[in-house]
């Protein structure tokens, strides 16, 4: 099953931790968003493979914006 991963807050992508093709465990950090001087992790909802990453470092993202797609195992 394919899972879309969304940003829970509006802010700037401070760091992308995972790369397309990476194998992820549930709750692995995909990216970190800076919002009001706080770092908010965007995590994988399930174990699987990161198949798409829509945001790059320094991109501005909106709340509920798609950040990534994970193909579950």
Model-derived regions: residue spans:
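Short beta-strand-turn/beta-hairpin segments enriched in glycine/proline and small hydrophobics
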Residues: 1-12, 29-45, 72
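Active-site-proximal flexible loops/turns
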Residues: 15, 41, 59
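Short histidine-centered loop motifs in beta-beta connectors
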Residues: 15-23, 52-55
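A structural signal for short beta-strand/turn segments enriched in small hydrophobics and glycine
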Residues: 21-30, 58-67
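Acidic-residue sensor for enzyme active/binding pockets
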Residues: 34, 39, 52, 57, ...
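Short alpha-helical linear motifs
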Residues: 51-52, 69-71
């Amino acid at each position: 099953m394919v899972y879309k991963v969304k940003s829970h807050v509006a802010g700037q992508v401070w760091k992308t931790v995972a790369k397309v093709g990476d194998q992820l465990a549930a709750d692995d950090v995909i990216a970190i968003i800076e919002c009001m001087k706080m770092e908010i992790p965007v995590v994988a909802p399930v174990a699987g493979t990161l198949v798409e990453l829509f945001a790059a470092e320094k991109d501005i993202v909106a709340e509920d914006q798609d950040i990534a797609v994970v193909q579950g195992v």
